Amino acid sequence: MEPVKMTNSSDDFTQSAEPFKLFAEWLADAAKSEPNDPNAVALATVDPDGLPNVRMVLLKDFDETGFVFYTNYESKKGQEILSAEKAAMCFHWKSLRRQVRVRGPVEKVSDAEADAYYASRPRGSRIGAWASKQSRPLESRFALEKAVAEYTAKYAIGDIPRPPYWSGFRIRPVSIEFWHDRPFRLHDRVLFTRPTPEGDWNKDRLYP
C-alpha cells in the first residue's frame, strides 16, 4: 500500500514560535474569506454546579495580554465568569478550514477601555445596553420595545453614559491551540501552553 500523501500549506504555521502573531495572521485571513463576522467566537463558561454553557460572542480586541469581549455583567455568562474567573473560546473559520481554541483565567477590562469601546458603538446599541435586562425573563417583545423607547427619550440629547453593569472581560490565555484541516483527517495541530499568563510559551505539535 502506498503511503498517504498530504498537501502542504502555503504558510507552514507549525513553525511559528509564538501564538499571537499567528492568530493575527489567521484573523486577517478570516476577514478576507468569511462572509459574516470573522471575529465571532464560541465562548464557554461553567455554572456553579460545573455545568457548561456556550454561546457566540464577538471578539473586540486582542493583544499579547489577551482576548477581549464585552457583555452585561449581570447576564448569565457575566455571572458565571465573575464566579469561576475562567473561560474558554473557540474560533472556527469554515471557509479556511481552521480553528483556534483559547483557555485561561479572565479579568475585567479597565473602565477606560470599556468607556472607549462603549462610546464607539452605534447609538442604538448603547440604548440597548440600558434597555435589555440580559438573560432575565421577558414578558413580551413590546416590553423590550417600551424600555428602548423610554431610554431613547431619556438620552435624547447628549452623550449616553455606559451602564455600570456593562463592561468587558479579557481572557488571559495559558493555552492556545491552532488546528488546520488536512486530507484523510491527518490534521495539523499546534498547542502553545504556559503555566501562567505571565509565563513563557511552550510549543507542542499534536497528533490529529
From Swiss-Prot:
User: What residues does substrate bind to?
Assistant: K60, Y117, R121, S125, R185, L186, H187
Q: Which reaction does it catalyse?
A: pyridoxamine 5'-phosphate + O2 + H2O = pyridoxal 5'-phosphate + H2O2 + NH4(+); pyridoxine 5'-phosphate + O2 = pyridoxal 5'-phosphate + H2O2
Q: What is its EC number?
A: 1.4.3.5
Swiss-Prot/TrEMBL GO biological process terms: pyridoxine biosynthetic process
InterPro entries (alphabetical):
Pyridox_Oxase, Pyridox_Oxase_CS, Pyridox_Oxase_N, Pyridoxamine_oxidase_dimer_C, Split_barrel_FMN-bd
Name the keywords, alphabetized: Flavoprotein, FMN, Oxidoreductase, Pyridoxine biosynthesis
Cofactor note text: Binds 1 FMN per subunit.
Instruction: Provide the residue positions that the database annotates as binding FMN.
Output: 55-60, 70-71, 76-77, 99, 134-135, 179, 189
Superkingdom of the source?
Answer: Bacteria
Does the entry feature the keyword Flavoprotein, yes or no? yes
The UniProt entry, under Pfam families, shows:
PNP_phzG_C, PNPOx_N
Pathway annotation: Cofactor metabolism; pyridoxal 5'-phosphate salvage; pyridoxal 5'-phosphate from pyridoxamine 5'-phosphate: step 1/1; Cofactor metabolism; pyridoxal 5'-phosphate salvage; pyridoxal 5'-phosphate from pyridoxine 5'-phosphate: step 1/1
According to the UniProt entry, its GO molecular function terms are: FMN binding; pyridoxamine phosphate oxidase activity
- What cofactors does the UniProt entry give for this protein? FMN
The entry's family comment says:
Belongs to the pyridoxamine 5'-phosphate oxidase family.
Q: Could you describe the subunit structure of this protein?
A: Homodimer.
Q: What does this protein do?
A: Catalyzes the oxidation of either pyridoxine 5'-phosphate (PNP) or pyridoxamine 5'-phosphate (PMP) into pyridoxal 5'-phosphate (PLP).
> Which protein, by its recorded name, is this?
Pyridoxine/pyridoxamine 5'-phosphate oxidase
Species name: Brucella abortus (strain 2308)
This chain is encoded by the gene named pdxH
